[in-house]
Amino acid sequence: MDFQPGELCAYYRLCRYLGIFCIDYNPTKKKFRLRRSVLCYIVHFALQAYLVGCISVMVTYWRRCFKSELTTTGNHFDRLVMVIALGILVVQNAWLIWLQAPHLRIVRQIEFYRRNHLANVRLLLPKRLLWLIIATNVVYMANFIKTCIFEWLTDASRLFVITSLGFPLRYLVTSFTMGTYFCMVHIVRLVLDWNQSQINAIIDESADLKMTSPNRLRLRVCLEMHDRLMLLCNDEISLVYGFIAWLSWMFASLDVTGVIYLTMVIQTKKSIVLKLITNVVWLSPTFMTCAASFMSNRVTIQANKTAKMLTKVPRTGTGLDRMIEKFLLKNLRQKPILTAYGFFALDKSTLFKLFTAIFTYMVILVQFKEMENSTKSINKF
């Protein structure tokens, strides 16, 4: 297959430099391939070794560098969030490097649809999103260094400071991974939209009996493309990125809870506006995860439009009717198109699950805090 590089090449290249996966565009053969370079694997295993080392240090010296402003519950929860963040990144990196072959098939199919059906469309979202990811990473890292290194860990050992730097790495790697997923889903949605425009044109011409035979062939091609796109989303994209999305949502619930809890417990002289800006920076990984779910939801809406469109087609008494009825019967009970590895659908309902998890964690933390305060009061007497 003769591919041309698209807007997502920058994402693939950056992910290769970060040791996430080895997919790259070969200009000589004009197609995407697995460029299994030694440097990519060195970066990958060096990052994995560093993260495992960070986890080991944090678990071994669990009570080291607890903040006096926090309760014991808050300190333990804060340390738990950091360890889980590092553990999730280790699993995420291993998952993506292991599934490079199916990932390459996804990339080739996405680029194939992009070249054949969206050649005249200028995609602005991937480039804008890339600059947004880079900017938020810089701000996030600067905020982490300012808050954690120069404020909370001023008295900590150098080893512990180096260990804590693994936390912002999770956002760096995950942001480019989810950014790639976001752009892939965006292209799938645009291809679905293009396919629906073709189906609309066929429906408009279906009244002309002379066009019945050619229209039947064209409609079959369009419906088969729809099925292939659904298969791409349901099986391959959900396989590679679904597990990553599930890990991201699981961490997002803990991360948001931690930020809210710290804001409630730690009293500072900062203005409300400054606190709000700081919290927005801390929660930028969660916003990226939520944005990916909204894009997935748009794909589901776009795909369901095809079935709704075909239900309104008047019957012609030809082979077109049987083809449409077969398609509608197969799509009558549409399963979730993009899922978090089968755990839940990636759509707007996921936000409700996130808020439910955050509320549950907050209730548990507050209860532990009250129990801790009660124990301290009893011990005073």
UniProtKB/Swiss-Prot annotation:
Taxonomy, superkingdom: Eukaryota
Recorded GO CC terms: axon; dendrite; membrane; neuronal cell body; plasma membrane
Main location: membrane
Phenotype upon loss of function: Leads to reduced courtship levels toward females.
Transmembrane segments: 38-58, 80-100, 130-150, 172-192, 240-260, 272-292, 351-371
Glycosylation sites per record: 373
GO biological process: chemosensory behavior; male courtship behavior; monoatomic ion transmembrane transport; sensory perception of taste; signal transduction
Cytoplasmic side: 1-37, 101-129, 193-239, 293-350
Membrane topology annotation: Multi-pass membrane protein
Record-level Gene Ontology MF annotations: ligand-gated monoatomic ion channel activity; taste receptor activity
Summary of the tissues where the protein is detected: Expressed in the adult labellar chemosensory neurons. In larvae, is expressed in neurons of the terminal external chemosensory organ, as well as in the dorsal pharyngeal sense organ.
InterPro entries: 7TM_chemorcpt (IPR013604)
Signal sequence, renumbered to the chain: none
Topological domain ranges for the Extracellular compartment: 59-79, 151-171, 261-271, 372-381
Keywords annotated in UniProt: Cell membrane, Glycoprotein, Membrane, Receptor, Transducer, Transmembrane, Transmembrane helix
Subcellular locations according to the entry: Cell membrane
Family stated for the protein in its record: Belongs to the insect chemoreceptor superfamily. Gustatory receptor (GR) family. Gr21a subfamily.
Function: Gustatory receptor which mediates acceptance or avoidance behavior, depending on its substrates. Plays a role in sustaining courtship behavior in males, possibly through the reception of a stimulating arrestant pheromone.
Protein name per its UniProtKB record: Gustatory and pheromone receptor 39a, isoform C
Species the sequence originates in: Drosophila melanogaster (Fruit fly)
Organism ancestry: Eukaryota, Metazoa, Ecdysozoa, Arthropoda, Hexapoda
Gene: Gr39a
